[in-house]
């Protein structure tokens, strides 16, 4: 009998578990540049705008390409937007890129209106999309959102989000971000009212600044929980990233952010967490907490006195099930493994 070593079996197991999106599901709308097939769309925006304004479930399948322009999802019924990929669990295999260029400095009018992809309705799921706001750096008013989440039960799976300031606006509703890549520098995961859960993601700092800016204004259920993520310096990070990255600062007086089981090779500031601004600290009623942070980025940490290191029992209170009890009704749980 032939024996297989673990090193041989693991790739076979991984291949067996891999899922691919290379053909449109039945009844899906299709986005495919240059296609002459009747009913195909040349842009994602056109496809989304053509969806019926009813409660039906709809799927949009996007073939490889770079698609320019803002996309707004606002219909009442559930929507899945699926990007072509040969491995749906690996964001490095993504082939679909959405690009927009807007910021407050360019006159967009609000944070949300700068977004490349604006999710304005509930029950929207995004798979294997690269979403970019290419505005870049500004001296002021540089808010330039890649993904704006304004609806309930938004799931983001193996997507990549790119900007510099305010990359991800997780603002209203219950949101999950699984096996994705989120890149930015200044307050690049932020919002006011959402409950947001992050697992299996790579979070990449491009320059100095804070990763999160929780804008929680009341003592309500809003929270960001990060579990089993990795924090790195982006491949093209600016030199000022070293020693100038923080896990978060409090945009709102009741900011609440928990990081659990985080691997951090990124060169964080030794205090790990930041006040909002000198003279406007906003730290009296916040929860900035960690459990089991590992890696060179926290090796010499001298944590701020307004932060909390959780015990094992305390950390166990912050799980996907505890903050989103009905998650199995809407989350694609395959991305939790």
Region spans (language model):
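Sequence-level preference for short, compositionally simple segments enriched
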Residues: 19-337
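Fungal secretory targeting signals
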Residues: 1-20
């Amino acid at each position: 009998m032939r024996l297989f070593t673990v090193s041989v079996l693991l790739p076979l197991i991984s291949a067996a578990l891999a899922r691919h999106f290379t053909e449109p599901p039945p009844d899906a709308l299709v986005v495919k540049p240059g296609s002459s097939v009747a009913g195909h769309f040349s842009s994602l925006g056109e496809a989304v705008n053509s969806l019926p304004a009813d409660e039906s479930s709809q799927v949009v399948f996007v073939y490889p390409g770079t698609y320019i322009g803002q996309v707004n999802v606002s219909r009442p019924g559930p929507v899945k937007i699926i990007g072509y990929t040969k491995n749906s669990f690996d964001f490095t295999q993504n082939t679909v890129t959405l690009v927009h260029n807007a910021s407050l400095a360019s006159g967009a009018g609000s944070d949300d209106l700068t977004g490349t992809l604006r999710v304005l309705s509930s029950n929207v799921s995004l798979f294997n999309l690269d979403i970019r706001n290419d505005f870049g750096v500004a001296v002021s008013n540089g808010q330039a959102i890649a993904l704006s989440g304004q609806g309930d039960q938004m799931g983001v799976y193996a997507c990549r989000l790119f900007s510099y300031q305010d990359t991800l606006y997780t603002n209203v509703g219950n949101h999950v971000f699984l096996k994705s890549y989120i890149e930015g520098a200044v307050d690049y995961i932020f919002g006011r009212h959402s409950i947001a859960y992050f697992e299996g993601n790579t979070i990449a700092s491009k320059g100095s600044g804070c990763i999160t800016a929780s804008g929680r204004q009341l003592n309500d259920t809003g929270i960001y929980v990060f579990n089993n993520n990795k924090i790195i310096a982006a491949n093209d990070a600016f030199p000022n990233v070293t020693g100038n990255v923080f896990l978060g600062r409090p945009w709102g007086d009741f900011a609440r952010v928990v990081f659990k089981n985080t691997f951090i090779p990124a060169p964080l500031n030794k205090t790990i967490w930041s006040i909002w601004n000198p003279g406007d600290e906003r730290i009296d009623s916040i929860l900035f907490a960690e459990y089991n942070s590992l890696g060179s980025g926290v090796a010499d940490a001298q944590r701020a006195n307004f932060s909390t290191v959780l015990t094992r029992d305390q950390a166990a209170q912050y799980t996907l099930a505890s903050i989103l009890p009905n998650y199995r009704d809407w989350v694609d749980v395959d991305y939790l493994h």
